[in-house]
Amino acid sequence: MRILLVTGSYPPMPCGVGSYTAALAAALVRTNSLEVGVLTGEGAINSNSGSGLEVVTLPCRWGWGDLGRLTRTIRKWKPDIVHVQYPTQAYGDRSAPWLIPAMLRMAGIPVVQTWHEFMPRAHWLRVAIAAMATRVIVVRPNYEASMARWFKKLLGQARPQYIPNAPVMEPCELTDIERQRIRERYAPAGRNLVVYFGFMYPHKGVEQMFEIADPERDQLVIAGHMDPAGSSYHRALADLAAAPKWRRATTFTGYLTEKNASDLAASADAVIFPFRDGVGSWNTSVAGVRTLGVFVIATARERQGYDAETNTFFCAPDDIPAMRAALRQQAGHRIPPSSGAITEAWERIAREHIILYRESLGSRSAR
C-alpha cells in the first residue's frame, strides 16, 4: 500500500503540524508494511532518507496557480491513498490545499484528512473538503460535538475518528555533565533556568512569563520564532525583555530544532506553558516535555495541583500567583524520564492509521 502524506510545512520549517507529519511518516515506515512518501514545499529535509521514506519537494505557494502542478505530482507518485494535513503554517490563506481532495476524488484516489484544529476557513472551503473526504482524523477529543448537524450529515461515513497525537520531541536523556554545559550556555551560575518554548501568540500567554519568573533569581529563556518587525505581540515581548530588570535576565533563542529544544527543556529547572485556554492532549510540545522528568508548570481548566507521575503542576489559566508559587517551591525538582514512552505512542498511532487506511480502500472497493 502506497501512502502519500501532503503537508505545506515539514522540518526544518517551524510548524507543529509539519513536525507531526514527519513523526507520523517515520512511524509508518517503521511498520515495514507501507511505502510512504511526503509531498511538501521547498526547504524540507528528509532526515529519514535511509529508512525508505521519500520526501517530494515542490516549489509551491499553495495558491490557485499551483493546484494543477500539485495534482500532477500526486498522480505521478501513484499513491493508493493521499493523506492531507490541515492546516499548516505554509498554507497560509491560500486555497489549493483545500481543493486537492476534490481534484483527487475526480481522479478516483481516496483522500484521508487530518484536522489538527477547528476549521476556521471560509464556509465554502470547509464544505469542499468535507464533501470530498474519504475519512477524517482529528487529534482533539470531542471534536464532533462542536460540529453543526448539517456538517455531520455532509461528512457521512467520513465523520471524524479521534486518534490522539503524541510528542514530536526527540527522546532525551542527558548526563549531568551534558546538562551542566547546556545550562552554562543559557544561565549564569546560581540562577534558575526557566524556559518557555513554542509558538508565540497572545493565546499562549507568553507575556505572563515575565510576571511568573523573578529576574533576581531566574534566567528566562524563550525559545521560538521571533519577528518583532512583523508582529505587534512579538514587539510587546521584546519590550518586556528590554525593561531594566529583565535586560540581563532574558534570552530569546529564536527557532530551535527538535533536538536542541529537547536538550534545552531537559536542562531547565522549570518549563512553563501559561496557555490562556489551558493545555490539552493535542499540545505535543507539552506532552513531550512531560516525558523528560523536568518540572513543568501548565495551565488547565479541568485539573489543578501537582501530578507526581509527570512532575507537572497544573494551575488555572491566568492564575499568575499560583504559577509563581509553584515555581518558587518546585524549581529544579526532577524525576526519571519516561524512556520509550514517545516511541510506544507513535507505534500505536501508526497502527491506528494503517487500520483506517485499509478501511478506506475497502470502502472505495465497495462503492
Ranges and model annotations:
Residues 188-204, 210-221:
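Conserved donor-binding/catalytic core segment of Leloir-type glycosyltransferases
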Residues 134-179, 188, 250:
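Donor nucleotide-sugar binding/catalytic pocket of nucleotide-sugar-dependent glycosyltransferases
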Residues 41-44, 219-238:
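Glycosyltransferase donor-sugar binding loop
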Residues 331-362:
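A charged, aromatic-enriched C-terminal amphipathic alpha-helix characteristic of glycosyltransferases
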Residues 234-259:
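Nucleotide-activated donor-binding/catalytic signature segment of Leloir-type glycosyltransferases, i.e.
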Residues 265-280, 294:
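Acidic donor-binding loop of glycosyltransferase active sites
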Residues 312-321, 328-332:
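Conserved acidic donor-binding segment of nucleotide-sugar-dependent glycosyltransferases
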Residues 130, 255, 263-268:
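Short alpha-helical donor nucleotide-sugar binding micro-motif in glycosyltransferases
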